């Protein structure tokens, strides 16, 4: 696979202009190392590309852990890239000291000194993140978006929020092709068999090795089973007691272990939308996995077979695909919006809500069928009535090819608007 320009690159370069430390986190194998090494060429360090060091190397890890300040000052104030930084927790306090000294000496020119990467969500590790409040910009790199994987520029989420559906085209890529490609860079072009082998190794290395490095879990062997159970529940409201019971854990432990999977960027939660609107709303998050192909692997299904023989599961996979696309595109772009789901206690629901900082909201429903009718807007119309003037519009994403209006700011739009 040739190097694909990642859509988050401008955000990283912009952050390096203003922040002394930029932390790029994300799951293992999302392409962080490749990306930061490409950026290193544009980060001059005494005329050369910025040095790149990875703490996966035992000697460098020993140095960073036992003499963190010496490790950092050894670069004499030049920009440096440090990969897998969560492996050396001692570095974070040392970074604070080194950055504060640089700010005292250099003022604004202390920006862009450290570009860090890590495979665990730094915000879930407050002991590490707290010393660097106000000194560090945090960005997240996910697996390929649909647009990245099909060599297009970004912009799907912007089009949705503007209700700009002119010239929506699949550009010759089928929905199934795109779901398979919008995955981890290493397996974009891999065969079904090679993907299976890769995912087996990937899950083992994260759940057996990486988790041990940041957390002491008594029943670590149950994590793969927990991940598989969550794969059967994608798009469902998360009930921690129920999930824990199925895995064989107490409710408290189950919730904690689910937090670990989220921290390693294997799963994600979509929070419930809430506002004082005079209706009782469900207050639990919906759960998804970070990669739709990973779900198929865990359930031992080929996605093409699922589409033909298991319509219910295929609907859940499509919802997972849209959830991850929205999360990835929000992470990559400057669009300011939060992702939620909407569900009332009497069962009226909308799959996704995008809320802008000004309170304006877009409702998105996912439908696997190739046609749309007015009934598919039922939940969206209830939501529209509740939010009134804050309603931007409602979109039903579906498997057909035509954009069609269904009322004032209500649209049926092909999935291909995402790529």
Predicted feature locations:
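Pre-Walker A adenine-sensing motif
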Residues: 1-16
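Accessory nucleic acid-recognition modules appended to NTPase machines
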Residues: 188-361
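Domain-level recognition of nuclease-like catalytic cores that cleave nucleotide substrates
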Residues: 399-419
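Conserved catalytic/switch belt of AAA+ P-loop NTPases
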Residues: 92-116, 130
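Short glycine-rich substrate-engagement loop in P-loop NTPases that contacts/grips substrate
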Residues: 48-79
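Conserved lysine of the Walker
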Residues: 32
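Interdomain motor-coupling "hinge/lid" segment immediately C-terminal to the ATP-binding subdomain
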Residues: 125-232, 236-237
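Hydrophobic positions on the alpha1 helix immediately C-terminal to the Walker A/P-loop
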Residues: 35, 39
